[in-house]
Protein backbone atom coordinates (compact mmCIF):
# COMPACT_ATOMS: atom_id res chain seq x y z
CA UNK A 1 0.00 0.00 0.00
CA UNK A 2 1.30 3.44 -0.90
CA UNK A 3 2.23 5.87 1.84
CA UNK A 4 -0.43 8.31 0.60
CA UNK A 5 -3.08 5.57 0.80
CA UNK A 6 -1.94 4.61 4.31
CA UNK A 7 -2.08 8.23 5.38
CA UNK A 8 -5.55 8.65 3.89
CA UNK A 9 -6.84 5.52 5.67
CA UNK A 10 -5.37 6.73 8.95
CA UNK A 11 -7.08 10.09 8.46
CA UNK A 12 -10.42 8.40 7.70
CA UNK A 13 -10.13 6.27 10.84
CA UNK A 14 -9.28 9.33 12.93
CA UNK A 15 -12.28 11.24 11.55
CA UNK A 16 -14.51 8.22 12.19
CA UNK A 17 -13.43 7.91 15.82
CA UNK A 18 -13.78 11.65 16.42
CA UNK A 19 -17.25 11.60 14.86
CA UNK A 20 -18.41 8.61 16.92
CA UNK A 21 -17.08 10.08 20.17
CA UNK A 22 -18.67 13.46 19.43
CA UNK A 23 -21.99 11.84 18.51
CA UNK A 24 -22.01 9.82 21.74
CA UNK A 25 -21.20 12.92 23.81
CA UNK A 26 -23.89 14.96 22.06
CA UNK A 27 -26.49 12.23 22.63
CA UNK A 28 -25.61 12.02 26.33
CA UNK A 29 -25.89 15.81 26.73
CA UNK A 30 -29.17 16.36 24.84
CA UNK A 31 -30.62 13.25 23.24
CA UNK A 32 -33.48 14.81 21.25
CA UNK A 33 -31.55 17.81 19.92
CA UNK A 34 -28.62 15.57 19.00
CA UNK A 35 -30.82 13.15 17.10
CA UNK A 36 -32.01 16.12 15.04
CA UNK A 37 -28.53 17.57 14.53
CA UNK A 38 -27.01 14.23 13.59
CA UNK A 39 -29.97 13.05 11.50
CA UNK A 40 -30.27 9.82 13.51
CA UNK A 41 -33.35 7.71 14.11
CA UNK A 42 -34.11 6.47 17.64
CA UNK A 43 -32.71 3.05 16.74
CA UNK A 44 -29.39 4.40 15.46
CA UNK A 45 -29.03 6.76 18.43
CA UNK A 46 -29.76 3.95 20.92
CA UNK A 47 -27.21 1.62 19.34
CA UNK A 48 -24.55 4.33 19.29
CA UNK A 49 -25.21 5.17 22.94
CA UNK A 50 -24.68 1.53 23.96
CA UNK A 51 -21.35 1.04 22.18
CA UNK A 52 -18.35 0.50 24.44
CA UNK A 53 -15.06 2.32 23.78
CA UNK A 54 -13.63 -0.87 22.25
CA UNK A 55 -16.64 -1.18 19.94
CA UNK A 56 -16.28 2.48 18.91
CA UNK A 57 -12.64 1.92 17.99
CA UNK A 58 -13.50 -1.22 16.04
CA UNK A 59 -16.26 0.59 14.15
CA UNK A 60 -14.00 3.61 13.51
CA UNK A 61 -11.39 1.37 11.86
CA UNK A 62 -13.55 1.12 8.76
CA UNK A 63 -11.94 2.24 5.53
CA UNK A 64 -15.11 4.19 4.70
CA UNK A 65 -16.24 7.45 6.27
CA UNK A 66 -19.02 6.83 8.76
CA UNK A 67 -20.38 10.36 8.69
CA UNK A 68 -22.36 11.64 5.74
CA UNK A 69 -22.27 15.04 4.09
CA UNK A 70 -25.89 16.11 4.57
CA UNK A 71 -25.76 19.12 2.27
CA UNK A 72 -26.53 17.22 -0.91
CA UNK A 73 -29.16 19.63 -2.06
CA UNK A 74 -28.37 22.97 -3.63
CA UNK A 75 -30.89 25.03 -1.65
CA UNK A 76 -29.50 23.81 1.66
CA UNK A 77 -25.88 24.33 0.73
CA UNK A 78 -26.54 27.79 -0.69
CA UNK A 79 -28.59 28.75 2.39
CA UNK A 80 -25.56 28.02 4.53
CA UNK A 81 -22.94 29.63 2.31
CA UNK A 82 -24.60 32.75 0.92
CA UNK A 83 -25.40 35.68 3.16
CA UNK A 84 -28.61 36.57 1.34
CA UNK A 85 -31.08 36.43 4.19
CA UNK A 86 -28.78 37.64 6.94
CA UNK A 87 -27.72 36.01 10.22
CA UNK A 88 -30.59 34.56 12.24
CA UNK A 89 -33.01 34.28 9.33
CA UNK A 90 -30.45 32.44 7.24
CA UNK A 91 -29.74 30.02 10.10
CA UNK A 92 -33.48 29.41 10.60
CA UNK A 93 -33.90 28.72 6.88
CA UNK A 94 -31.04 26.18 6.94
CA UNK A 95 -32.53 24.50 10.02
CA UNK A 96 -35.90 24.15 8.29
CA UNK A 97 -34.24 22.64 5.22
CA UNK A 98 -32.29 20.18 7.39
CA UNK A 99 -35.45 19.23 9.27
CA UNK A 100 -37.06 18.17 5.99
CA UNK A 101 -34.39 15.53 5.44
CA UNK A 102 -35.30 12.01 6.58
CA UNK A 103 -33.39 10.50 9.46
CA UNK A 104 -30.96 7.67 8.83
CA UNK A 105 -32.41 4.21 9.31
CA UNK A 106 -30.61 0.91 9.70
CA UNK A 107 -30.93 -0.97 6.45
From Swiss-Prot:
SUPFAM superfamilies: Flagellar transcriptional activator FlhD. GO terms for cellular component: cytoplasm. One of its GO terms (molecular function) is DNA binding. Its main location: cytoplasm. Keywords: Activator, Bacterial flagellum biogenesis, Cytoplasm, Disulfide bond, DNA-binding, Transcription, Transcription regulation. The keyword Metal-binding does not apply. It is found in: Cytoplasm. One of its GO terms (biological process) is positive regulation of DNA-templated transcription. It holds the Pfam family FlhD. It comes from the Bacteria. Functions in complex with FlhC as a master transcriptional regulator that regulates transcription of several flagellar and non-flagellar operons by binding to their promoter region. Activates expression of class 2 flagellar genes, including fliA, which is a flagellum-specific sigma factor that turns on the class 3 genes. Also regulates genes whose products function in a variety of physiological pathways. Belongs to the FlhD family. The C-terminal region contains a putative helix-turn-helix (HTH) motif, suggesting that this region may bind DNA. Homodimer; disulfide-linked. Forms a heterohexamer composed of two FlhC and four FlhD subunits. Each FlhC binds a FlhD dimer, forming a heterotrimer, and a hexamer assembles by dimerization of two heterotrimers. This is Flagellar transcriptional regulator FlhD. The gene is flhD.
Amino acid sequence: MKTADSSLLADIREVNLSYLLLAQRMLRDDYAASMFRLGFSNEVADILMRLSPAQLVKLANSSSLLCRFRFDDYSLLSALTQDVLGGALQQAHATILLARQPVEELA
